[in-house]
Design a protein with these regions (language model features):
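N-terminal maturation segment of proteins
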Residues: 1-287
Length: 287
């Protein structure tokens, strides 16, 4: 029936999104096989320059599928899910959804700051988890290369971040690389060693081999990736948005923030409407 067809579609969407990166998959499902997800080569996923034309084609395909479901034939729970998916679709149709203003890097919560934490806290439940973790370290140079290409394009388009933000990211990269000359004492290696010692998944010989592999990957992949990112950002320094008002003064700045308000906060009001509301106590309560 309609509920079964809709549930199959939702499960397919879930599979697609949760397998977009090994980090997402690992932190979402403890046992991917229980949801029919087979092991694959672990990667951080892709970072690409936004392409509105191809994205619109994808959204059209999604809309065709979603509107094919008869809402009144769905269960109450599935009706709510359909409404949420349609709301998300409307958000993604907004011009700001593919804006180059979206910034994966940042001085406080950027990818370069989150990755060491995500990798250090990566749970080792099975031998496959450890193999995936090591594959992720190997994939980091490719992933950071994609990030660098995106930042270079942002610079060419005049929407690269300002020097204050860049300096903060570079400082974080430098702090991460502080122990690069002694990888055996780096935080990631120390944490990895402690987790292996607490695990019963490997023999002593296998643990030692994992530690050797981990140390080599830090030296050959992880540290060079962070150096490359730092060097690339240094070369782009001074080419970012320096004007007062920041990104909101860019050509599509307001449309981007309107998209963020609707997609991340669930607020349908425009930035201008919110500004007016915030100027009055009653307006603030109305939110």
């Amino acid at each position: 029936g309609e509920n079964r067809r809709f549930s199959a579609y939702v499960e397919e969407r879930f599979h697609s999104e949760v397998t977009s990166s090994a980090i997402t998959l690992h932190y979402t499902l403890a046992d991917p096989a229980s949801r029919g997800i087979a092991p694959g080569t672990a990667s951080f996923g892709t970072v690409s320059i936004p392409d509105r034309t191809s994205y619109d084609a994808l959204l059209q395909s999604v809309e065709t599928t979603l509107t094919s479901f008869h809402r009144n034939r769905l269960s109450a729970e599935n009706q709510i899910t359909l409404d949420l998916l349609l709301y998300e679709l409307d958000c993604e149709k907004m011009p700001g959804s593919t804006s180059l203003l979206a910034e994966p890097l940042g001085p406080s919560l950027g990818i370069q700051a989150q990755l060491p934490i995500l990798l250090a806290e990566y749970p080792f439940r099975t031998q496959q988890d450890i193999a995936d973790y090591l594959h992720l370290l190997q994939d980091l140079p490719r992933y950071f290369s994609d990030l660098i290409a995106l930042e270079q394009e942002k610079s060419r388009q005049g929407v690269f971040q300002n020097d204050l933000a860049v300096d903060g990211i570079i400082r974080q990269c430098s702090a991460f690389l502080a122990d690069a000359d002694t990888p055996e004492s780096h935080l990631l290696h120390t944490v990895f060693q402690n987790k292996l010692q607490a695990s019963s998944l490997f023999s002593e010989a296998e643990r030692n081999l994992c530690l050797q592999t981990h140390e080599k990957l830090l030296t050959s992949c992880v540290f060079p990736a962070y150096r490359s990112l730092s060097d690339a950002l240094s070369s782009l320094r001074g080419k970012g948005t320096q004007n007062a008002g920041g990104l909101s003064r860019q050509e599509d700045g307001l449309s981007y923030y309107a998209y963020l308000l609707r997609s991340r906060v669930g607020v349908d009001a425009s930035p201008e409407e919110l500004t007016r509301l915030f100027k009055t106590p009653l307006g603030v309560y109305a939110l």
